[in-house]
């Protein structure tokens, strides 16, 4: 019986993985990886067997029960299995179900955190998610329910919505229904954490204007305090400028 390590690969480029994550990935015999992880991560574990268990929105996807079963199967055959997840395993990553599957079969596990897309978007645009005095709370929300219904909330000073890129116009309507004024600041970042990240600034009422720019790209939408510029001077760098 082996051990499973869940590793957050970060939301984009391979160098966003943590040092601990890279070290443990290098020790893997088998790697079950998500669709949005950087192929360059294979360089950390070139001798491991890599198994694609990715989910792709509106395309081919490995079912969650199939992933759970495969994870258990591989852990029963190998000493060290890595479950490589995009972003952070604990944020909208179905981690609970996979942990439960392992626990049911008495398989040991540990979890290594990673950078989630909301944080990568905040870093890329230099827009902190929390602000002193007017941005004291943050909510990370999937815009799609388990039944595929679009939802929006107003429960925090900054709301970050995942998986909303295909329905920005509808999200705008839901946000205003939830109590966000139409002129509230909103920020859309697609492929956050990658060199080709795209950024657009809007008011909530005009979010539909971003659909063409971000079409076909995984995007996060930040609304409220964390969407506003942190620097108000006219010489601040563009959000699209390369950043280390």
PLM region descriptions:
Residues 1-112, 206-219:
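Class I S-adenosyl-L-methionine
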Residues 2-4, 76-81, 94, 137, ...:
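A contiguous loop/helix-start segment that scaffolds small-molecule binding in enzyme catalytic cores
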Residues 11, 36-38, 54-61, 115-117, ...:
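Short, acidic/turn-prone active-site loops that include or flank metal/cofactor-
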Residues 19, 120-124, 171-172:
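Short hydrophobic alpha-helical segments that form membrane-spanning helices or hydrophobic packing faces
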Residues 38-41, 118, 148, 168-169:
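Short, well-ordered alpha-helical microsegments
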Residues 49-55, 106-110, 129-135, 181-188:
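Short hydrophobic/aromatic-enriched beta-strand-loop microsegments
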Residues 88-156, 198-201:
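Class I SAM-dependent methyltransferase SAM-binding "motif I" and its flanking Rossmann-like core
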């Amino acid at each position: 019986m082996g051990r499973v390590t869940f590793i957050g690969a970060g939301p984009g480029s391979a160098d966003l993985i943590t040092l601990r994550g890279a070290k443990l990935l290098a020790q893997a015999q088998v790697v079950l990886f998500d669709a949005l992880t950087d192929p360059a991560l294979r360089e950390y574990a070139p001798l491991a067997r890599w198994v694609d268990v990715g989910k792709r929105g509106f395309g081919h996807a490995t079912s969650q029960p199939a992933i759970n079963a495969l994870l258990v199967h591989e852990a029963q055959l190998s000493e060290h299995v890595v479950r490589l997840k995009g972003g952070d395993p604990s944020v909208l990553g179905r981690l609970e179900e996979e942990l439960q599957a392992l626990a049911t079969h008495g398989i040991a596990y540990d979890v290594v955190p990673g950078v989630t897309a909301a944080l990568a978007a905040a870093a890329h645009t230099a827009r902190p998610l929390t602000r002193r005095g007017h941005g004291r709370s943050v909510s990370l929300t999937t815009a799609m329910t388990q039944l595929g219904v679009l939802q929006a909330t107003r429960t925090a000073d900054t709301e970050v919505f995942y998986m909303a890129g295909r329905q920005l116009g509808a999200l705008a309507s839901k946000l205003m229904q939830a109590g966000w004024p139409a002129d509230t600041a909103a920020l859309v970042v697609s492929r956050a954490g990658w060199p080709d990240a795209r950024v657009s600034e809007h008011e909530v009422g005009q979010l539909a204007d971003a659909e063409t720019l971000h079409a076909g790209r995984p995007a996060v939408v930040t609304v409220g305090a964390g969407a506003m510029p942190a620097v108000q001077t006219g010489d601040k760098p563009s959000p699209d400028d390369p950043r280390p």
